[in-house]
C-alpha cells in the first residue's frame, strides 16, 4: 500500500443513526491524539476509574461550566494501534435522541484540537494506518446498508478479507508473469528461453477467474440493490390490488375508478435473499387530466429503468386493443411478464377473449389479486428470475467501483492477446500486463493516490 502522511488532527462524529424517538442508545466517536484528553475534559467520572486501554468507564458529560450534566454515559477507551482507526479512540455512549447527542458533540467540537469528521473518515484512517484493507472498509459500509441477509453475508465475507485475498492472488500471478518476461528482456543471454505457451495459458486462466468475478458482480448488485419490478397496464386492471397482495400490506389505494393511481408507489419483499421492489405505476392511457398525464410520464421513465416489467390485463374482459397498444410501448430490452388478473370473475368465454399468441407465451401467469389464486405461479416465476439460482454459490461480489477496475483489467488482458497474435516483441507484452496489475492494485488499495481515497470514502456515511 502507498504510504500517506499520518493524520495529526483529532476528529469526532455521531457514529449511530439518530432520529427523534428512535433508538435508546447513541454513540459519539472520537479518534486522534487528543481523543482521550478531550474526553477527560468533558466528563465527570466518579471514584477511581482506570483510563487505560480497552476499559469501559461510567460517568456524566457536563456542561462547559462543569456544574450541570448533559447526560449519563459510558466511555469506551481504545488506545492505538489497537483500535478501529489505529489511533487513540474514545466512544461515548449516551441515551438516544437528537438533543443529548448533539449537545455532547458540540462540547467535543468546542475544543480547537478537534474537528468534525468527514464522511467515511474513520474508515479512511483505518485504511491509511493499515488496520483495514480498502475492500474491507468498503464491505463494512455495505454491511451497514445491507437490505437482506444475503447482502449482509456477502459484506461479512468482504470484511473477512475474501475479496482482498482473491484479487491479490490474481494480481500476484500477473506479477509473476511480468517478472518472467522482464527478466528475459534484461538478461536474455543468462536465462533459459521464455516459455511463451505457459505465459499465454496462465493469462487465459487468469481471464477465466476474473470473468467469473465480473459475472458474479451482476448477481451481487441484485443482492445489494435488489430488483425493480414495474407493474403496468391500462387503468383499473388491478395493478394496485396485485401490489398489495404481493407485499401483504395496503400500499396502494384500490377503487373501481380508472386512473386512481397517479403517483409512483413502491413496496419491497425479500425473495431468496434478494430485495424485490414492486413499483405500482399510473395506468397508461390517453387522458386530458394534467395530473394523470404527469403520472403517466413518470410511469414511462420508471419502465425504462426496471429490471422486470409485469404487464397486467383484465383476464375476465379479455385482451383489448388498449392492452396491445401498451405492449407495443414497452421497452424491448427489459424482460416482460404478462399477468392476466381477475381470474375470479372469468367464465367459459373468458379464455376465448385472449389471443392465442398471448396464451402461448411462456411468460404468462393467470391470477386473482382478490382471492390469491395463481399467486404461487407468479412467485415461482419471480424466484426463477431472482431466486436461489442467482445467489447459490455466491460468496464474494465486487461493488461498482471494483467492477469497473476488474473490467479495465480484463480489457488490458484482452489487449495482450492481440499482442500474442501479432507476434510482437516481449516489450509490448509488458505494457498491458503492467497496466492490468495497476488496475488490480487500485482495486485492493495497494496502488492508490490520496485523492482517489478521498473520493471513495466521501460516499460513506458520517461516523463510519
From Swiss-Prot:
Gene Ontology terms for molecular function: GTP binding; GTPase activity; metal ion binding
Cofactor note as given: Binds 1 potassium ion per subunit.
Keywords from the named record: Cytoplasm, GTP-binding, Hydrolase, Magnesium, Metal-binding, Nucleotide-binding, Potassium, tRNA processing
Top-level taxonomic group: Bacteria
Cell compartment(s), UniProt: Cytoplasm
Domain TrmE-type G: start-end pairs: 226-387
Residues reported to bind Mg(2+): 240, 261
Binding-site residues, K(+): 236, 255, 257, 260
List of residues binding GTP: 236-241, 255-261, 280-283
A GO biological process held by the record: tRNA methylation
Binding site for (6S)-5-formyl-5,6,7,8-tetrahydrofolate: 29, 91, 131, 464
EC number of the protein: 3.6.-.-
Cofactor(s) for this UniProt protein: K(+)
InterPro entries membership: G_TrmE (IPR031168), GTP-bd (IPR006073), GTP-bd_TrmE_N (IPR018948), GTPase_MnmE (IPR004520), MnmE_dom2 (IPR027368), MnmE_helical (IPR025867), P-loop_NTPase (IPR027417), Small_GTP-bd (IPR005225)
SMART domains: RAB (SM00175)
Transmembrane feature ranges: none
Principal location: cytoplasm
Top EC category: hydrolase
Recorded GO CC terms: cytosol
Xref: NCBIfam families: mnmE_trmE_thdF, PRK05291.1-3, small_GTP
Family classification: Belongs to the TRAFAC class TrmE-Era-EngA-EngB-Septin-like GTPase superfamily. TrmE GTPase family.
Subunit structure of this chain's protein: Homodimer. Heterotetramer of two MnmE and two MnmG subunits.
Function: Exhibits a very high intrinsic GTPase hydrolysis rate. Involved in the addition of a carboxymethylaminomethyl (cmnm) group at the wobble position (U34) of certain tRNAs, forming tRNA-cmnm(5)s(2)U34.
Record-given protein name: tRNA modification GTPase MnmE
Organismal lineage: Bacteria, Bacillati, Cyanobacteriota, Cyanophyceae, Synechococcales
